[in-house]
């Protein structure tokens, strides 16, 4: 299946699995998706992930995280920069998500990182998505 926006597809699959209380979700793999999922793990939004080599593209298996009584850890995911409308932020214009409760994921010249890391390093870049 050809997907015009792979990052939006990743976020939609995670959102749908989260709303259905699934334990895991499989998404087609890429370096960019792996970097985004690694940030989600480091920030505590998912439990874990693994790369499954299937001979060509690879698959990322994401293990979702829930709190006590099956409360969702991920409240929302939003794609910001889209193929039809790219959104860039200078280093002093990096957005804060819910006053610092969520994260913005940026693609910078030094790789994919959170809004906090980009501010610390003084970098701007493409705002990929918000997670809260």
From Swiss-Prot:
Molecular function terms, GO-annotated: rRNA binding; structural constituent of ribosome
Key words, A-Z: Ribonucleoprotein, Ribosomal protein, RNA-binding, rRNA-binding
Gene Ontology cellular-component annotations: ribonucleoprotein complex; ribosome
Job of this protein: One of the primary rRNA binding proteins, it binds directly to 16S rRNA central domain where it helps coordinate assembly of the platform of the 30S subunit.
Lineage summary: Bacteria, Bacillati, Bacillota, Clostridia, Eubacteriales
Annotated PANTHER family: 40S RIBOSOMAL PROTEIN S15A (PTHR11758)
Protein name as catalogued: Small ribosomal subunit protein uS8
UniProt source species: Symbiobacterium thermophilum (strain DSM 24528 / JCM 14929 / IAM 14863 / T)
One GO BP: translation
Family, similarity comment: Belongs to the universal ribosomal protein uS8 family.
Gene3D superfamilies named in the record: 3.30.1370.30, 3.30.1490.10
Subunit field text: Part of the 30S ribosomal subunit. Contacts proteins S5 and S12.
PROSITE patterns: RIBOSOMAL_S8
InterPro entries registered for this protein in UniProt: Ribosomal_uS8, Ribosomal_uS8_CS, Ribosomal_uS8_sf
């Amino acid at each position: 299946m050809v997907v015009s926006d792979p990052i939006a597809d990743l976020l939609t699959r995670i959102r749908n699995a989260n709303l259905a209380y699934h334990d895991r979700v499989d998404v087609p793999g890429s370096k960019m998706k792996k970097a985004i999922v690694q940030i989600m793990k480091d920030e505590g939004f998912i439990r874990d992930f693994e790369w499954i080599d299937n001979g060509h593209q690879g698959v990322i298996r994401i293990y979702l995280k829930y709190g006590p009584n099956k409360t969702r850890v991920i409240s929302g995911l939003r794609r910001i920069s889209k193929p039809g409308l790219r959104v860039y932020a200078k280093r002093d214009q990096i957005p804060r998500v819910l006053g610092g409760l969520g994260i913005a994921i940026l693609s910078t010249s030094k790789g994919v990182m959170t809004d906090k890391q980009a501010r610390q390093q003084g970098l701007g870049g493409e705002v990929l998505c918000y997670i809260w």
